[in-house]
Amino acid sequence: MTELSVIIPMAQEWPMSAFTVRSVMEELEGRVDYEILTVDNWCPELEAQIKKSGALKDRSADHFDALQKGYPWLKSLHYDKKLSHWQAKNYAVSQSKGKFLWFCDAHVAVRRDSLFNMFTYYKEHYDELNGTLHLPLSYHIMEYHKLIYKLVTDLTRGEVHYSFTTYRNAEKPYQVPCMSTCGMMMTRQIYDDLGGWPVELGIYGGGENFINYTLAVLGKTVNIFPGKQLCHHGDKRGYSWNGDDYVRNRTIANYVFGGVDLARKFVDNRKGSKRVLYNILDNVLDTCKDHRAFIERNQVTTIEEWIAAKGLPLPAA
């Protein structure tokens, strides 16, 4: 019976994707009943960008399609509806079997025993954690220093965000307000409680805001597993996104965890055409209303109350 499903979305990641899968396999083989689900996100939008740039098509999908025939722990999936690693992850979860889910990018190296030890701990303590567990990160693969996230807010502008900060060591896992979804472990039940990532999310922005701050209003926690970091390879992938996509994704996240007013404040304070911005807002309020209603029915606090409990200032009434 599969215990752990490892979800790895990819778009223009070759050959780092192969090294990523290999490092995960080396970590788990013979130690955990696991599966690795790679999700190739080649789609018309990405194809058009790659043709325009003159870059070569990613070889990852062909490689993993062939490889899965000899490795029962590997599933090579394809998601081509739109360019979005959030939707690629949603699709992979729907095809997975594990009670526990671990998400990572296709450009990481897993340090020996880090993932195994984290999974061993999480399997024993997930009930008391009541939330997610994350490995610290190094942004560039050869860096020694470790990073986590810190909370960055300005509710007058609809900003509920994050940035990198220095990791602090500890003897056991500790709570933080937010953390990267690269290296994130959760139960399938928590994924279901979140409703998965909102189906309207595109390629960039919003996905981590959604996870962290929807967990917050649901009364769940975000936790760091101290020790070895997940070594991340920060680099360009040969594709891009535009500002409207980013605003839309952040607006989706704000709306789902914070409601109409928070989404509107965020849009009010963006630069650009007001007509375009408010068209984005209207579309988000229409297409994401079911997900917002789902979270609103189950939340135990508001994002404003949660921020106040962290000791951060709220805007004047």
Regions found by a protein language model. Give the residues of each.
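Glycine-rich, basic loop-to-helix element that forms the pyrophosphate-binding segment
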Residues: 79-96
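Short, acidic, metal-binding catalytic loop of nucleotide-sugar glycosyltransferases
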Residues: 22-33
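A conserved acidic beta->alpha catalytic loop
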Residues: 38-63
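The conserved acidic donor/metal-binding loop of glycosyltransferases
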Residues: 105-109
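A recurrent flexible, glycine/aromatic-enriched loop bordering the glycosyltransferase active site
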Residues: 86, 166-185
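Conserved donor NDP-sugar-binding/catalytic core segment of glycosyltransferases
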Residues: 113-156
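Terminal low-complexity segments of carbohydrate-biosynthetic enzymes
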Residues: 181, 242-317
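Short aromatic/hydrophobic "clamp" motif used to bind/position activated sugar donors
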Residues: 101
